[in-house]
Amino acid sequence: MAMAMSDSGASRLRRQLESGGFEARLYVKQLSQQSDGDRDLQEHRQRIQALAEETAQNLKRNVYQNYRQFIETAREISYLESEMYQLSHLLTEQKSSLESIPLTLLPAAAAAGAAAASGGEEGVGGAGGRDHLRGQAGFFSTPGGASRDGSGPGEEGKQRTLTTLLEKVEGCRHLLETPGQYLVYNGDLVEYDADHMAQLQRVHGFLMNDCLLVATWLPQRRGMYRYNALYSLDGLAVVNVKDNPPMKDMFKLLMFPESRIFQAENAKIKREWLEVLEDTKRALSEKRRREQEEAAAPRGPPQVTSKATNPFEDDEEEEPAVPEVEEEKVDLSMEWIQELPEDLDVCIAQRDFEGAVDLLDKLNHYLEDKPSPPPVKELRAKVEERVRQLTEVLVFELSPDRSLRGGPKATRRAVSQLIRLGQCTKACELFLRNRAAAVHTAIRQLRIEGATLLYIHKLCHVFFTSLLETAREFEIDFAGTDSGCYSAFVVWARSAMGMFVDAFSKQVFDSKESLSTAAECVKVAKEHCQQLGDIGLDLTFIIHALLVKDIQGALHSYKEIIIEATKHRNSEEMWRRMNLMTPEALGKLKEEMKSCGVSNFEQYTGDDCWVNLSYTVVAFTKQTMGFLEEALKLYFPELHMVLLESLVEIILVAVQHVDYSLRCEQDPEKKAFIRQNASFLYETVLPVVEKRFEEGVGKPAKQLQDLRNASRLIRVNPESTTSVV
């Protein structure tokens, strides 16, 4: 009943405080008038405080829930933006492929259109500014839009314009000697770093009918440039970069295996660059296709004429010609062969890579034992162009710019088709580069929060899981291929392990974590690394080699800390027995010494809570054994001498201090107590250290044996006032 009244009072109080016309001063005045005394005010105060705490908890809970929803929404928006960006690229590729199909199906119509464009262009007059430049050399539907024999005024004008512009570029005189080359478009650009989006330099781009010249701006001379790079349009891909203020009006040029990002003056200039690059690439591809068709065309009339006008030709020479004519008869009239180039275009446009490669395999199998007369060569030339286009699309599928969320299995489709096309080495290189980018992205996205050991658990799980999945997928994709691919994978795995160790060392060793934390982190990394042995991949020696320098530094640093602490305790040594005051404290010390391996510690305990040892010797024992235990977790053969020398240095500090105290002490009782501590060090602590070291390493340490078996204590200078020589 009282609980119900309390709840109703709290709800009434909440409604009163939440009302729109609530005034605090008037409320306090009424409350003071209505209360019977101090007790009522105290109870009311408690109710208000409880209500305040409840409100604060609700507010905190709502903020946390809204924050989580905000983070999840932002992450989904980021994923959606990435997918939309990739979808835009796919639509652009399909548009380009669909536009190229009519040119293939209707070469006569395309040629007529090109001739019409040529006639129209010769009659076009110049204009001012940038339009004047484009009127001379600008957007052509094909490179043959003007006269190609040099007799037309348009061709001469383009050549003069190209010569004039290239004379302003240092280091590209050889380009002026290329016949048939003319300028299509040019303009100023700003280059940005592809990784950090930092401005690099001002450049000027010269787009010719078969290549792209990039020249850097010389600030010392107005209007002069220096040659930077020349890219063939065959291996050049143009990608639109989505505006992300202040980074806008940008586009990317992909030249395997590198990429460059440029910024245009404005959106209009950027659109012109994208359009003219695509148009020029398409025109160059069409031109080369026609040249291949002309080169593959049969030259029958000259051969017939030569035979008809040669009355002295012997019959013996005609005999081998009969089977030669018969060999040239290859049936290419089948419907699937006639439609093969168009079917390949459709498969590439629809991203049916398997279907395209199946058609190529079918054709190769059909022509495997057939001769190569001109019709077959012509067909092969058409098919080779489609193979090149298919290879470019598959290479783009494996580029790191693509989505990495699908894991290594997402690359299997493109890799398998590249292998079927005979591009095994390229497939291996692109697959490993894609996975390296995925591993780098996964490590970079890890949040550094909370304890170091928790972060290392996440880091090891992410990295070694990715490495294991990559190894299994590699074994599936490249089974039965050249063994050189497996060598490339081992090299890649070592490089990836270096990336992991960089992130590991930065968090564990550079942040000066304790030796125990570092030992636990290294232990976790070793355990994950040993899991790779399930697939026959042992990288333990690599992680040892990469971590040895950092672990040596950690051992040396912690050794110096122990030595300094021991020296400080030695300077304050009074050689008195320890009094732990309570049985609980004595029991705790016994457990600690037992965990250190000192099993006979009971004989050094006296009546009540006394211990017949010095505080300095007991503290030294616990610290030394703790150092040894943590160091053994970090141990591998390359660290053997480092660990052994560190132990000897630490032990010598305590031994020298005891020896010096024995020589300097005059009181017989204290001298006997010092001898008891020395006996504990030599007969108990050193054997325990030696035994534990041998158990952890697997072999005894001669230096520790010599130190324990010394016939007398180490000599020191009797006149010295320090504990170390």
UniProtKB/Swiss-Prot annotation:
Post-translational modification Phosphothreonine, affected residues: T142
GO terms for cellular component: cytosol; exocyst; growth cone; late endosome; membrane; perinuclear region of cytoplasm; plasma membrane
Subunit structure: The exocyst complex is composed of EXOC1, EXOC2, EXOC3, EXOC4, EXOC5, EXOC6, EXOC7 and EXOC8. Interacts (via PH domain) with GTP-bound RALA and RALB. Interacts with SH3BP1; required for the localization of both SH3BP1 and the exocyst to the leading edge of migrating cells.
Disease linkage: Neurodevelopmental disorder with microcephaly, seizures, and brain atrophy: An autosomal recessive neurodevelopmental disorder characterized by severe global developmental delay, developmental regression with loss of milestones, severe microcephaly, and brain abnormalities, primarily cerebral atrophy and hypoplasia of the corpus callosum. Affected individuals develop seizures in the first year of life. Death in childhood may occur.
Residues of the PH domain: 182-282
Function, as annotated: Component of the exocyst complex involved in the docking of exocytic vesicles with fusion sites on the plasma membrane.
Entry-annotated residues carrying Phosphoserine: S19
MF-aspect GO terms: phosphatidylinositol binding; small GTPase binding
Name by which UniProt lists this protein: Exocyst complex component 8
Domain of life according to the entry: Eukaryota
Keywords of the record: Cell projection, Cytoplasm, Disease variant, Epilepsy, Exocytosis, Phosphoprotein, Protein transport, Transport
Gene Ontology BP terms: endosome organization; exocytosis; extracellular matrix disassembly; Golgi to plasma membrane transport; membrane fission; mitotic cytokinesis; protein localization; protein transport
Alphabetized InterPro entries for the sequence: Cullin_repeat-like_dom_sf (IPR016159), Exo84 (IPR033961), Exo84_C (IPR032403), Exo84_C_1 (IPR042561), Exo84_C_2 (IPR042560), PH-like_dom_sf (IPR011993), PH_domain (IPR001849)
Species this protein is from: Homo sapiens (Human)
Localization per record: Cytoplasm; Cytoplasm, Perinuclear region; Cell projection, Growth cone; Cell projection
Protein family according to the UniProt entry: Belongs to the EXO84 family.
Region (Disordered) location: 137-159, 285-328
CDD domains on file: PH_RalBD_exo84
Effect in UniProt of substituting E265G: Found in a patient with Joubert syndrome; uncertain significance
Extent of Acidic residues compositional bias: 312-328
Main location: cytoplasm
Keyword Ribosomal protein: no
